[in-house]
A protein has these predicted regions:
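Short alpha-helical elements
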Residues: 1-185
């Protein structure tokens, strides 16, 4: 069984299955098969003792890994990259954004929270090149304190909430990040 899983992972079968299912769900929901918008976020997850590539997220005070995700406007996963929790969100976003630019023709706008503001926006514009795609920072409303739902951002938060409900994804115990990426898909 493990040999099949490993072989399919190496051959990209899992990613192709996910891609096909996502397209079918989008079409069934009345959308085009390619997303026109996407949302970026990250989530720090505790790891087991034997997990490698873990780090310490000083902001959240958690030892573990960080899951960088991009979802479409239905909350369906487009790309997931798992790395050490010590990587800043702006730095960890680069590979996942690059994967979205390479893997999808559709997104014209990608929304992100203010943690991604700054040099990442200029870097993204350079990577997008002539393609009509922008990284838009969704800022908190001024004068509003406490929790407040931000436009588009709630979609990625809902998806991350779904992922945490899975026993296998709530705390990563795998030795390598690759199976964790695959489990997220």
């Amino acid at each position: 069984m493990h040999d099949y899983y490993r072989r399919w992972r190496q051959q990209g079968v899992w990613e192709q299955v996910h891609h096909t299912l996502r397209q079918k769900v989008r079409v069934a929901a009345g959308k085009t098969d390619q997303p026109s918008g996407a949302i970026l976020d990250s989530q720090t997850i505790k790891t087991g003792d034997q997990a490698c590539a873990s780090g310490y997220d000083a902001g959240k005070k958690i030892e573990g890994r960080k899951r960088h995700v991009v979802v479409d406007t239905l909350g369906l996963l487009l790309r997931v990259i798992v790395g050490p929790a010590s990587v800043q969100d702006r730095d960890g976003a680069r590979p996942v954004l690059q994967a979205v630019l390479l893997g999808f023709t559709g997104p014209r706008k990608i929304w992100a929270d203010s943690g991604y503001a700054g040099a990442l926006v200029q870097w993204f514009q350079a990577q997008a090149g002539p393609r009509d795609c922008v990284l838009e920072i969704v800022r908190r409303l001024e004068g509003v304190s406490g929790f407040h739902v931000l436009p588009k951002r709630w979609l990625v938060e809902r998806t991350l909430g779904w992922l945490v409900k899975s026993r296998h994804l709530a705390a990563i115990t795998k030795r390598r990040p690759t199976p964790a990426n695959q489990c997220s898909i």
